[in-house]
Amino acid sequence: MPDNRLTSHLTTQTSLTDAINSWEAFLSDKGRSPNTIKAFLSDVRLLTSFLPADTTLGKITTKDLNRYFEWMENERAVPCSPKTLARRITATKSLFRWLHQYGVLMVDPAEKVAQRSAISPLPQVLTSEEYDAVLLAADRHRRGSKPDARSYALVYLLLTTGIKKSETLGLKLEHVDLETPNGPQIFIRYASPANRYKERKLILPDDWIPAYNEYLSQYHPTEQVFPWSPRRLEYLLEDIGNEAGLTKHLSFDMCRWTCALKDYRAGEEPDKIRQKLGVSKIQWRELHNKLKQLSGM
């Protein structure tokens, strides 16, 4: 049986605001990140301003929720993108599913609310020629009069592992193991229990190791592998992209998608690519569809 200590005081006569406050405590107990909780609460609190002030949980119907999302999509003064609308529907469904699961509501009014599609445009990726040009531009810094392996160590790591910006910033020296029997690898770690499914070990290319060792001897990082701000690392990528003659904006996201597409075109099993990227099976559906489209271009 679910632990209902956070819902035991809730009834059909409870206000939506009080229910949201209890849900906040539930999300915190589940290990959701502060940013995730903040986003969820922001999304569902809009509903309290739409419904009449005296509306209790038991009075909220599927019709009310559909009318709310129609207002948000077409009538509200503040524009709402398809992606934002889809996220707000997801948050609202999550709240009412929780109230139903824990016995506060006998019927979930959000269950039959249609989820909107929020398919974003296809991401930009590097062509084979651009891929080579980027690595060549980064490698020139290693061979200059003042050798600097930082850019190469960063961009080649991104292009071969597909790790995200947040994962790059969270990567510590202890997460890099060059001596495992299966070859050099990195361990992507997450502090929050809610993100444990994203943790994974990724094989490193052997030819990344010399650049990494050069980088360590030049910069002497003590904890983080790349101890700079997100913006500083973004600038590094932008500079390499410019030096490579790209008309595109080289970014963490572009490197991640380029890595995934390269693996996909090489015939890697889709589920292995999913695990390499650290995404759930639900998230993978859209990513997989985009890889199929990109592969055919």
Regions found by a protein language model. Give the residues of each.
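Alpha-helix N-cap/helix-start motif at helix boundaries, enriched for small hydrophobics
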Residues: 92, 154-155, 162, 166-171, ...
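Basic, Lys/Arg- and aromatic-enriched nucleic-acid-binding interface segment
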Residues: 133-161, 165
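Conserved tyrosine-mediated DNA breakage-rejoining catalytic core shared by Y-recombinases
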Residues: 170-208
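Short, basic (Lys/Arg/His-rich) helix/loop patches that form interaction surfaces
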Residues: 143, 222-224, 235-275, 279-280, ...
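DNA breakage-rejoining catalytic core of tyrosine-based enzymes
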Residues: 105, 119-135, 195-206
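Active-site/catalytic core of tyrosine-dependent DNA strand-transfer enzymes
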Residues: 203-247
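A short, glycine-centered helix-capping/turn motif at helix boundaries
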Residues: 103, 157-170, 266-268, 277
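N-terminal core-binding DNA-recognition domain of tyrosine recombinases/integrases
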Residues: 4-5, 21-35, 41-122, 141
